[in-house]
């Protein structure tokens, strides 16, 4: 139904206590990166936000994070889902702490929201009040600044991003042009926390307006 939360699901989680030198080289790890934490889930954008939370909760870095092609609905295997993320840290204990923070965030009630009655159109409008090292690097902003993380299907996203930029004192620092790997689109906007929240609200409202009247122009 409209405004329903589409809850994300974690599909697999594993720790590599002592990563092999060959793997470390391929992942371009730093010398202090001794252990890895791996996760897959059925929602990429929530997982990316959760991985950023991990960097604030533990001594870990996000060293790999990629979306799977065509999204979770077209996953080729049981545990592939929509995204794989890899955390790296100096010890298994730190990596475990980072993974626990990731899991806690995914289970906290954050997720895509349905824009219509049959849940066939959904969007992600998450205000990140304080970025960690991962999202701040992705957005090219200082760590700790606020972000509006906005994602929707292609047309809905383009229309709603324009509305968000006009509704609040925010700047676009990263644009996810359609189609992304999962056939969506979106952006990262930055500004004050209140401005980012206003941008999220405007984005959500605009996506819902498209969903309710897709052919009216």
From Swiss-Prot:
Homotrimerizes to form a pseudohexamer. It comes from Clostridium perfringens (strain 13 / Type A). GO terms for cellular component: bacterial microcompartment. It is found in: Bacterial microcompartment. One of its GO terms (molecular function) is cobalamin binding. InterPro entries: BMC_CP (IPR044870), BMC_dom (IPR000249), CcmK-like_sf (IPR037233), EutL (IPR030983), EutL_PduB (IPR009193). The keyword Signal does not apply. Ethanolamine 1 binds at residues 44, 82, 112, 182-184. A disulfide bond is seen in native crystals; it disappears upon reduction with tris-(2-carboxyethyl) phosphine, which also reduces the protein's affinity for ethanolamine. It has been suggested to confer redox modulation to pore opening. Disulfide bonds join 127-200. Residues 1-110, 111-217 form the BMC circularly permuted domain. Ethanolamine 2 binds at residues 45, 176, 180. The record marks 69, 74, 183 as: Important for gating. Keywords: Bacterial microcompartment, Cobalamin, Cobalt, Disulfide bond, Metal-binding. It holds the Pfam family BMC. Belongs to the EutL/PduB family. This is Bacterial microcompartment shell protein EutL. CDD domains: BMC_EutL_repeat1 (cd07049), BMC_EutL_repeat2 (cd07050). Cob(II)alamin binds at residue 32. The lineage of its organism: Bacteria, Bacillati, Bacillota, Clostridia, Eubacteriales. SMART domains: BMC. A component of the bacterial microcompartment (BMC) shell dedicated to ethanolamine degradation. May be involved in cofactor diffusion across the BMC. Cobalamin is covalently bound to 1 subunit of the trimer on the concave (lumenal) face in a closed pore conformation; whether this is physiologically relevant is unclear. The closed form has 3 very narrow channels (1.3 Angstrom at their narrowest) per trimer lined by acidic and aromatic residues; 2 ethanolamine molecules can bind in each channel, on either side of the constriction. Has 2 BMC domains which can evolve independently of each other. Two ethanolamine molecules bind in the interface between these 2 domains. Ethanolamine 1 binds on the cytoplasmic side, while ethanolamine 2 binds on the lumenal side of the BMC. Coiled coil: none annotated.
